[in-house]
């Protein structure tokens, strides 16, 4: 019943000529939408590595309270492997883990691992530098997941 209701809402959104995306912090959101192949146009899902000083420790990633409402990308490898099977565009967010990961590392990791777009928070004075970093990475990027947008 829940997925049928969600499918109806997606159709209503599309009737207005608006794209409809779904996602969140938990990979299960994307997985559950993919099972019945609901007609969303794109996904938005957190992605970042855990190679930073304040990264979650393995024991912090096992309990629901640590991941939900979701402050981390709990299992980046599981996400990357799953998204490799998804044929819709993917916007990765929280790629810099609230500033704990440098833009170059964050953007490289996200794009190399299949994200089609990166939603990155930054201050106005960081835009030019971060855009240059992204352009440099994209000009010399090797990835296995095909670009979806």
PLM features: residue spans?
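Histidine/lysine/aspartate-rich catalytic loop segments that bind and position anionic ligands
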Residues: 34-70, 81
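Catalytic beta/alpha-barrel core
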Residues: 1-2, 19-26, 44-49, 67-73, ...
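Glycine/proline-rich, positively charged
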Residues: 1-41
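Glycine-enriched alpha-helix->loop->beta-strand junction motifs that scaffold or abut catalytic
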Residues: 14-15, 35-44, 86-89, 112-117
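Short, glycine/charged-enriched secondary-structure capping and boundary segments
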Residues: 2-3, 35-38, 57-59, 104-107, ...
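Short, catalytically relevant binding-site loops at active-site mouths
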Residues: 26-31, 48-52, 98
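Short, small-residue-enriched loops and turns at beta-alpha junctions
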Residues: 1, 50-51, 72, 97-101, ...
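Structured C-terminal cap/extension of enzyme domains
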Residues: 8, 77-92, 96-149
